[in-house]
Structures are given as structure tokens and as C-alpha cells.
């Protein structure tokens, strides 16, 4: 399993005000930490930005990005995802994972049967949910990402062992 050198840490939600500020949606555990992981890059690496947080705004952070001086420039960046170099991010503890490292992992049940692969990781406020697809499934399998349901994550071999609650299989 190969690791990506950059991880998505946020996205630009649009312009904020008329002086080139942006509404920045942070995907970091502590939202304001996004500014300390810079420079941040576009997905293709074609642009980089230094981030200066200005104020909290509803559901996001107000921020200035280097090289963005007008509302029009800020508007043009709406929807752009921002990536940080992995080595700028904090070290993770045992049993902590970046979502990007889970996506694509093979998922097997405790008996060894293939359940599919992690397609996405969702969090709607109550904890992470793994979306597992493939292995002949017509619908995605949604697994709570808890130790009880996912007792083993082995990044070195690209595998998760899951023990889905009865009825979820």
C-alpha cells in the first residue's frame, strides 16, 4: 500500500468579504491548526498558499491566502481542496489513522471472507463510518469505525479486519 505524500486538510468554501478573504473549511481535528501546516497546495500541486486565519465564520474559518487579493480571485477558488505535506502534520498515536490511508484498503470479516474495499470515510458528528464497496455488493456496507467493529487495521499489508454487527453484513 503506498502512502500519499500530501493529505487533504481543507477546502475553500468561497469568498468572504470584498478584500480577497476566503471561507476556509478545515478538515483538521483542531480546525485552526490548518494554518500551521502550510504551505498548502492545490490537488495538482500547481499552486501553493500561505494561510493566515482572520476570524471564525459560520461553519468555517475566515482566512487570507497568499497571492489572493480580490473577491474575484477568492471566488475563483471556490471548491478547491487544499493539501499539506504529510511530514508537516502531527504524528499519530497507535490506532489513529488519516482517512486517506484507509481509503482503498481491503476489508475482510473475522472469518477471512472478502467484504470489499474502503471507498470513503464519513463523519456526520457521531464518529467515523467506513463505506465499503465491491465484492459483488449492490449497496455499500457502512461500518462504524470502532474497535468493536473494526478490531484490526494493518496498513503494511493494506487490510482491515471487520466484525460487522449482525444484519449489516
UniProtKB/Swiss-Prot annotation:
Matching InterPro entries: PRC_barrel-like_sf (IPR011033), PRC_RimM (IPR056792), RimM (IPR011961), RimM_N (IPR002676), RimM_N_sf (IPR036976), Transl_B-barrel_sf (IPR009000)
Domain of life: Bacteria
Annotated localization: Cytoplasm
Domain PRC barrel: 94-168
Record GO biological process: ribosomal small subunit biogenesis; rRNA processing
Any single Gene Ontology cellular-component annotation: cytoplasm
Coiled-coil portions: none
Pfam families named in the record: PRC_RimM, RimM
Transmembrane segments: none
The entry's keywords: Chaperone, Cytoplasm, Ribosome biogenesis, rRNA processing
Gene Ontology terms for molecular function: ribosome binding
Location, primary (coarse class): cytoplasm
Similarity field: Belongs to the RimM family.
Function recorded in the entry: An accessory protein needed during the final step in the assembly of 30S ribosomal subunit, possibly for assembly of the head region. Essential for efficient processing of 16S rRNA. May be needed both before and after RbfA during the maturation of 16S rRNA. It has affinity for free ribosomal 30S subunits but not for 70S ribosomes.
NCBIfam families, per database record: 16S_RimM
The record's note on its domains: The PRC barrel domain binds ribosomal protein uS19.
Description of how the protein assembles with itself and partners: Binds ribosomal protein uS19.
Protein name: Ribosome maturation factor RimM
Organism: Cereibacter sphaeroides (strain ATCC 17025 / ATH 2.4.3)
